[in-house]
Amino acid sequence: MSALDALLNPVYETKTKEVALGNRLIDPDTGKPATFTLRTMTTDERASIRKRCIVTRESGDGKYNEVDNESFLARCLVECCVNPDLKSTAFCTFPPREPGAKPIVVSPDVALKRRLLVPEYERLASAFMELNAMDESNPAEDAVTKN
């Protein structure tokens, strides 16, 4: 089989990984910690998200563009979370702060950061980075860098 055949007929399309974020989020059906299911992302998805996270900064030398890493990670998590659906209206809607006011609707990446505690968010982010080989200790990337 040639490399082209392998590319056109991959063994799998996407990998998934389930991760429990802690004991605070309990599945009402099982009574066990709820799990989030993450999937791998494509290079195109990553590039599209990265492009949306470019911000312009100013320094003494003028203006320059850089990636807002916090926004990039949150958007990647939303895009790659298969279950629960982090783009759902229910997830993105918060109760009004004042009686009689309308519910507050925010973007999925903002809702994710508001709903999860720091350790939960960190577990989800770590699982995402491991699944997509974006962790800092990736041996494949280390080998490429060394050569």
Model regions and ranges:
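Extended acidic low-complexity intrinsically disordered regions
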Residues: 1-16, 27
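A subset of signal/propeptide-processing and intrinsically disordered low-complexity segments
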Residues: 4, 8, 22, 78-80, ...
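Mixed-charge (Asp/Glu-Lys/Arg
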Residues: 13-23, 34
